[in-house]
C-alpha cells in the first residue's frame, strides 16, 4: 500500500545501525552485500572474491552507505573483476559508488519498485554538513562520470555532489515504478523534506539516461 511505502521511506532519514560491517553471503554465483559500509570492507570483499572465484554478480541491498574510501575502492574492484551489480532495496552514498562499479548495472524486483532506488550525494562532515574539500580532493565528479561510462550529465552531478546535507540525495528509481501523481522517477532531495525520496522534487532524466543502470531489465536475487 502507498501509505506503508511512504512511512517506510520516511524512516530512512532516522535509521541508525550498530552492525560492525556489511553483511555478506554468497548464493550460487552471486555475492549479496547489505547494511552499512565500514572500514575493513575492502579486505572482506577481496577475501570473498578469493574464496569464491565464480562470482559474477554483486547484489547491494538496503545500504545507506558509510565509509567513504570503501565505496570508491570496492566499486573499482567490481569493475576490475568485470562483475555486474544489482540494487536490491535502497543503495545510497558509498553504496552507490559500489553499484556504479558494475560492468552491467540493473534494478531488482526483490522489493516493490517504489522501495528500490540508488541515491547519490557528496561527502560530509560528522555533523552532516557538506565537506567540499573532500569532494574536490577525491575527484568525485570525474569518478562518477567515468563509472557511468561517460553518460552522467556533469551539470547534474555537480549539483548532487554539492547537496549541503547528508540527508539529501538524487534518487533514481526504475521508470516502471508506479507513483501517484508523479511521472518522473528521479528525485532531487535537499535533505529537509519530510518524505524522502517520494516527497522531493523530480527531475526529467532517467537512471538509464545518466548511466546509473545499463539496461532496464529487472533482476531477481537468488535468495528471494
Question: Where are the regions a protein language model picked out?
Answer:
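STAS-typified acidic loop motif
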Residues: 21-44
